[in-house]
């Protein structure tokens, strides 16, 4: 069976997110798993770390690639990254779910197509579709 190396990669930065959400490893794990489910991804592994005095890093290893979050509660900041291989699972769905669950304001967003030659920036296309 031949496999495609085609993938989509989204990075998203959020600001003005509540400290309590960004410092709650249980909450973040729950919303990350739900984000993966919403986009149809299959979780095959995880690692979540609560830092002291604050902050969380969480990674879900997906059959289709990965979904990660790094939080800075003292700054109200979250860095989210989702890469999925193939055509079925849409990382934008996971990122949209996380934005809704966390609240805050998107201050950085990049959508890329990978694995089929040069990395292609799809950011404008995704944002235009999202605004319709």
From Swiss-Prot:
The record marks 64-65 as: Cleavage (non-hydrolytic). Its EC number is 4.1.1.50. Gene3D superfamilies: 3.30.160.750, S-adenosylmethionine decarboxylase domain (3.30.360.110). Its cofactor is pyruvate. The active site is at 65 (schiff-base intermediate with substrate), 70 (proton acceptor), 85 (proton donor). Is synthesized initially as an inactive proenzyme. Formation of the active enzyme involves a self-maturation process in which the active site pyruvoyl group is generated from an internal serine residue via an autocatalytic post-translational modification. Two non-identical subunits are generated from the proenzyme in this reaction, and the pyruvate is formed at the N-terminus of the alpha chain, which is derived from the carboxyl end of the proenzyme. Binds 1 pyruvoyl group covalently per subunit. GO terms for biological process: spermidine biosynthetic process. GO terms for molecular function: adenosylmethionine decarboxylase activity. InterPro entries: AdoMetDC_C, AdoMetDC_fam_prok, AdoMetDC_N, S-AdoMet_deCO2ase_core, S-AdoMet_deCOase_pro-enz. The modification Pyruvic acid (Ser) is found at residue 65. Keywords: Autocatalytic cleavage, Decarboxylase, Lyase, Polyamine biosynthesis, Pyruvate, S-adenosyl-L-methionine, Schiff base, Spermidine biosynthesis, Zymogen. Pathway: Amine and polyamine biosynthesis; S-adenosylmethioninamine biosynthesis; S-adenosylmethioninamine from S-adenosyl-L-methionine: step 1/1. Pfam families: AdoMet_dc. GO terms for cellular component: cytosol. It catalyses: S-adenosyl-L-methionine + H(+) = S-adenosyl 3-(methylsulfanyl)propylamine + CO2. SUPFAM superfamilies: S-adenosylmethionine decarboxylase (SSF56276). Heterotetramer of two alpha and two beta chains arranged as a dimer of alpha/beta heterodimers. NCBIfam families: SAM_DCase_Bsu. Catalyzes the decarboxylation of S-adenosylmethionine to S-adenosylmethioninamine (dcAdoMet), the propylamine donor required for the synthesis of the polyamines spermine and spermidine from the diamine putrescine. This is S-adenosylmethionine decarboxylase proenzyme. It comes from Symbiobacterium thermophilum (strain DSM 24528 / JCM 14929 / IAM 14863 / T).
């Amino acid at each position: 069976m031949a496999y495609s190396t085609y993938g989509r990669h989204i990075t998203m930065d959020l600001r003005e997110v509540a400290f309590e959400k960004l410092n709650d490893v249980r909450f973040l794990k729950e919303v990350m798993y739900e984000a993966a489910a919403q986009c149809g991804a299959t979780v095959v592994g995880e690692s979540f770390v609560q830092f002291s005095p604050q902050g969380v890093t969480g990674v879900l290893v997906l059959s289709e690639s990965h979904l990660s979050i790094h939080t800075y509660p003292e700054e109200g900041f979250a860095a989210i990254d989702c890469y999925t291989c193939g055509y079925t699972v849409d990382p934008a769905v996971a990122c949209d779910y996380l934005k809704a669950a966390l609240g805050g304001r998107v201050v950085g967003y990049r959508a890329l197509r990978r694995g089929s030659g040069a990395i292609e920036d799809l950011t404008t296309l995704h944002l235009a579709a999202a605004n319709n």
